[in-house]
């Protein structure tokens, strides 16, 4: 059975930020673009915010060592040295674990880290055992000089589930982490009991073919093929330098957060500091040229057609990159799903954490714990 509902924050948090009282007017909302997929060019250049997010080593100036509260949610304490580390294929992988109970595994988006779940981990840990890990190449995990593709992170999370979690769990992912969650669920059907997607990356086959045709003339024909690797490195080196500037990161974040109250120094610095890693530039180059330009190899319909567990779609409808049409299409394709509309942008878990936590906890109690008779969520 599929279910759909709309959750919005309280009137105050919907219209005003926790530290700002600027209303969000309809005209602002109308200016957002509702696209069904992330444009690879936009993601590589504008979204390069996060491409430099590869290893946070400094200490943000704003957060204290203790967890703080926002919108009723405790915030995970920032630790410049990280929390826990696990060795995977010779690489150091960073992760956080909090709470007890049914495990939840949180997977961040492109260029982010476990700290993007700062307002979710402790709240969810009041009822569940919550894991959040940094994907290889991002956050506190090693900046491995390997050939990156979607299956690298699928293999990483799959092994993390087997070696660290070791029991049935629900996997939750945002953006790139969402598509990774789907591929992990397909590969581990006996261990993944449910999947929750927050503005997931990924394309349907028809969209992928159409985009490939467009990019054959725009990117491949006129840029990629004629340009030699050295020139690519020069251009991407400049983009990397530009992307890691705090002012640029803040600007891009504000373009995908409708309520920008949570675009604070903590978040900006957690993305800008990673660029200090010696391998950051090379990882950026490999991600831009080898991963982002080959996303069409993996499609949502091919993955969803093999998945068997319940699916929750927590969707920021005002996302300028991945609009609500994508969520509706996924829901129509995969019938064992529930859709929750959120008045937020691309990162609803950080923009409206209270609404996300409530919706996720409700689904976990009503659907995952009772798979034989899922209920329609009402708000």
What name fits each language-model region?
Residues 11-12, 75-90, 96-98, 125-128, ...:
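Active-site loop/oxyanion-hole signature of alpha/beta-hydrolase fold enzymes
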Residues 109-119, 130:
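Serine-hydrolase catalytic-loop signature spanning alpha/beta hydrolases and amidase-signature enzymes
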Residues 335-379:
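Catalytic active-site module of serine/aspartate enzymes centered on a nucleophile-bearing elbow/loop
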Residues 147-155, 161, 167, 172, ...:
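Flexible "cap/lid" subdomain of the alpha/beta-hydrolase fold that forms the substrate-access gate
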Residues 2-104, 126-129, 159-161, 165-167, ...:
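Alpha/beta-hydrolase fold catalytic core
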